[in-house]
Swiss-Prot record:
This is Adhesive plaque matrix protein. GO terms for cellular component: extracellular region. Its main location: secreted. Residues 158-359, 397-636, 660-751 are annotated as: Disordered. The keyword Cytoplasm does not apply. It comes from Mytilus galloprovincialis (Mediterranean mussel).
Length: 751
């Protein structure tokens, strides 16, 4: 087709020139075919004549092919036939030079004009917009979702299974009173830090994590779900955007008025006022709903008012209950029957599928996971998963699941064997090209969008491999130029003398070196002629090649050699005058200015960087113990000052002189009484946690060694398993840092 178009266009131009039709650029029959077609397609044709639009792509290969013929027409002999026309062509040589800029420009530009209307609007804009049209269809499912949110209201009849399920949930309200065990429970908060591995068991757990999405009574899908997050943004203006929100919110507008239908609604929700037990009187006070604003303390009822939605934000304690309901998984251990549900839960996860048989058959519906899109909260997981990643950032808790997610990523193929194996496909994201209709895969191929330049003639893909400019050496005549060209470029002047050996060199191209223009052989290469228009990016090397050596020596030296060198070579000239040790030492160079104060030499301990935080904590522990910091200068005696320090209150007046021996009497005496009053602030409830006393015993025992710290300093050495940097640093301040830190101790003593 291109050959037909080209022949027709050349014939048209040829006939126009014979008939005397000229558009200001084409002047004769022959000049129209070559010089006119090239020069006419430069500027005036695209606007003055329809060739610029349709036939421009055709003239591009013509131009690129015959652009060597800018030097070509004198060799062609048109000057002998058309000397005045040759003058005009020489007058167009500036235009050709301007087109040399256009050779860079139109091949870039008109390909943009050829295919981008198909794709630049599509790839750039559909990810923003076609998800929107595809999403409004799903957004109708959202409109079905607010209606399905009414199935949430109908789901509370299944909320009786929630009432069967809230046995864990009633431990939540019973658990906020146990919230004081939660402050005592921060030792298990370290078990939270130990819990992220169990949070990997959340990764094995997430199959039930969909019950988490169902577990918050679809409440966290409201929070984590971006559309409802928009409802948050629309929710502070609360009514206008909710008025603009689908009709489902109009039941919300009727819903505060039908707040009494909330009281009629509570077949599930009367259990809510029943478990607050104080709120039974509050629903009995529908009129005292005004008494709720009269209750500034019932501002908690205001959180329970917005639909208890803000109640959870007002439950900062229950916000800990949110990580604690991931830990309520541990609360299940604290809840003995559900503790059995724990061991049956992660391993016998299938018993879980048998556990809520009416509920996890929904999880057995992951083949009917489309029903999950129909199921509103999991459908939220759908609009979260087409982004898949943004929705995961919307899972702020599950976003931590992402960090734990890559290691347990295999566990995710175990978990979402139905679908998230597709997220395991993202390496097979080409399956996503197969996964949209492969057309969006083309949209996802804007990098392969150059493959669409390979799409129109498949030659622009060859312009797409100007890296295959080395393929130009693979091209035989330029292959000669490359062996003579790149490094043996000086050898080319040697070949200039042996240039006669060049015609003797390629026996295959003796005729071609006899035709130094080598372009009559190129017209003898009409198929390779098309390869030449496909070859234009290397063609620039061709016009740089007819100069052959002046431009190329300036070009590869200035560009290729420098581009090959600039990281190494520019770094070498830039740094050796400035600082050779700097490029050699750029990391250690920082260590050098940081090294003299010896603190950044401590950053040189970043492997012992735990020793660093242990070191500043001790140093901060000195400001945190400013009295004990003085005890640390007294502490190089290490022992007398601290016995003088703890007993300071009574033992000093009682035993000033026999003090060291009475220090033994003091551990014997205050532990009987004073250590007990000192411990109730430290937690005797912690020793009263013999069940939790394992972790807490390891933890408050760390406090007891702190108070018995000078003698039980070796128990700090037993204490390291919690903080090896800490046991390492109290010793290391004396052992690893003895010359430095003892100099500091000698400083206070000298001070």
């Amino acid at each position: 087709m291109e050959g037909i178009k080209l022949n027709l266009c050349l014939l048209c131009i040829f006939t126009c020139d014979i008939l005397g039709f000229s558009n200001g650029n084409i002047y004769n029959a022959h000049g129209s075919a070559y010089a006119g077609a090239s020069a006419g397609a430069y500027k005036t044709l695209p606007n003055a004549y329809p060739y610029g639009t349709k036939h421009g792509p055709v003239y591009k290969p013509v131009k690129t092919s015959y652009h060597p013929t800018n030097s070509y027409p004198p060799t062609y002999g048109s000057k002998t036939n058309y000397l005045p026309l040759a003058k005009k062509l020489s007058s167009y040589k500036p235009i050709k030079t301007t087109y040399n800029a256009k050779t860079n420009y139109p091949p870039v530009y008109k390909p943009k004009m050829t295919y981008p209307p198909t794709y630049k609007p599509k790839p750039s804009y559909p990810p923003t917009y076609k998800p929107k049209p595809s999403y409004p269809a799903t957004y109708k499912s959202k409109s079905s979702y607010p209606s399905s949110y009414k199935p949430k209201k109908t789901y509370p009849p299944t909320y009786k299974p929630k009432l069967t399920y809230p046995p864990t949930y009633k431990p939540k309200p019973s658990y906020p009173p146990t919230y004081k065990p939660k402050p005592s429970y921060p030792a298990t908060y370290k078990s939270k830090s130990s819990y992220p591995p169990s949070y990997k068991t959340k990764k094995t757990y997430p199959s039930s994590y969909k019950p988490k999405k169902t577990y918050p009574s679809t409440y966290k899908p409201k929070v984590s779900y971006p559309p409802t997050y928009k409802s948050k943004k629309s929710y502070p203006p609360i009514y206008k955007t909710k008025a603009s929100y689908p009709s489902s919110y109009k039941p919300k507008k009727t819903y505060p008025s039908t707040y009494k239908p909330k009281i009629s609604y509570p077949p599930t929700y009367k259990a809510k006022p029943s478990y607050p037990t104080s709120y039974r009187a509050k629903p009995s006070y529908p009129s005292t709903y005004k008494a709720k604003p009269s209750y500034p303390p019932t501002y908690k009822a205001k959180p329970s008012y917005p639909p208890t939605y803000k109640a959870k934000p007002t439950y900062p304690s229950t916000y800990k209950a949110k990580p604690s309901y991931p830990p309520t998984y541990k609360a299940k251990p604290s809840y003995p029957p559900t503790y059995k549900a724990k061991p049956s839960y992660p391993p016998s996860y299938k018993p879980k599928t048998t556990y809520p048989p009416s509920y996890k058959p929904k999880i057995s519906y992951p083949p009917t996971y489309k029903a999950k899109p129909s199921y509103p909260p999991i459908y939220k997981a759908k609009p979260s998963y087409p982004p898949t990643y943004k929705a995961k950032p919307s899972y702020l808790p599950t976003y931590k699941a992402k960090p734990s997610y890559p290691p347990t990523y295999k566990a995710k193929p175990r978990y979402p064997t139905t679908y998230k194996a597709k997220p395991s496909y993202p390496p097979t994201y080409k399956a996503k090209p197969s996964y949209p209709p492969t057309y969006k895969a083309k949209l996802s191929y804007p990098p392969t969008y150059k493959a669409k330049p390979s799409y129109p003639p498949t030659y622009k893909a060859k312009p797409s491999y100007p890296p295959t400019y080395k393929a130009k050496p693979s091209y035989p005549p330029t292959y000669k130029t490359k062996p003579s060209y790149p490094r043996t470029y000086k050898a080319k002047p040697s070949y200039s003398s042996t240039y006669k050996a060049k015609p003797s060199y390629p026996p295959t191209y003796k005729a071609k070196p006899s035709y130094p223009p080598t372009y009559k052989a190129k017209p003898s290469y009409p198929p390779t002629y098309k390869a030449k228009p496909s070859y234009p990016p290397t063609y620039k090397a061709k016009p740089s090649y007819p100069p052959t050596y002046k431009a190329k020596p300036s070009y590869p030296q200035t560009y290729k050699a420098k581009s090959s060198y600039p990281p190494t070579y520019k770094a070498k000239p830039s740094y050796p005058p400035t600082y050779k040790a700097k490029p050699s030492y750029p990391p250690t160079y920082k260590a050098k200015p940081s090294y003299p104060p010896t603190y950044k030499a401590k950053p040189s301990y970043p492997p012992t960087y735990k020793a660093k935080p242990s070191y500043p904590p001790t140093y901060k522990a000195k400001p945190s113990y400013p009295p004990t910091y003085k005890a640390k200068p007294s502490y190089p005696p290490t022992y007398k000052a601290k016995p003088s320090y703890p007993p300071t209150y009574k033992a000093k007046p009682s035993y000033p002189a026999t003090y060291p021996s009475t220090y033994k009497a003091k551990p014997s005496y205050p532990p009987t009484y004073k250590a007990k009053p000192s411990y109730p602030p430290t937690y005797k409830p912690k020793p009263s946690y013999p069940p939790t006393y394992k972790s807490k015993s390891s933890y408050p025992s760390s406090y007891k060694p702190k108070k018995t710290y000078p003698p039980t300093y070796k128990p700090k050495l037993t204490y390291p398993p919690i903080y090896k940097p800490k046991p390492s640093y109290p010793p290391t301040y004396k052992s690893s840092y003895p010359p430095r830190y003892k100099k500091k101790i000698s400083y206070p003593s000298q001070y």
